[in-house]
């Protein structure tokens, strides 16, 4: 089975490194971006199987990224997992209405991240 390619987007380099390590150990191919704009650029250059994105980032946040993906006919079916430390119900609702399929609250475990990713990749 070919390696699944995951795009991880977060403005915190420590979180990016953590998620990349978790996924790489499970044989995923991982690309990273520090903000939504960089993610959009990567999405235009390469093929991905899923996106894991932080909700709150400067410039283009996770919801704006999700909306951009869902408005692109070539990317609209790409599953998006939103990750955030925020517990605001409005943010969760906005994430789903933007096009995210799952929501992962921080802090999270490697097992919970991998379980959600497996769900969206089926």
Regions found by a protein language model. Give the residues of each.
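Receiver (REC) domain active-site loop signature in two-component systems and cognate sites
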Residues: 57
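C-terminal output helix
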Residues: 108-117
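Charged docking surfaces used in two-component/phosphorelay signaling
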Residues: 17-25
């Amino acid at each position: 089975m070919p390696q699944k390619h995951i795009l991880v987007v977060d403005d915190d380099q420590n979180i990016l490194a953590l998620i990349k390590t978790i996924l790489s150990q499970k044989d995923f191919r991982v690309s990273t971006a520090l903000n939504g704009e960089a993610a959009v650029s990567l999405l235009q250059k390469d093929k991905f199987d899923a996106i894991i994105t932080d909700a709150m980032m400067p410039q283009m946040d996770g919801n704006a990224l999700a909306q951009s993906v869902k408005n692109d006919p070539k990317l609209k079916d790409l599953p998006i997992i939103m990750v955030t430390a925020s517990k605001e119900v409005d943010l969760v609702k906005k994430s789903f209405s933007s096009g995210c399929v799952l929501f992962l609250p921080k802090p999270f475990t490697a097992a919970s991240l991998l379980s959600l990713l497996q769900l969206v990749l089926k």
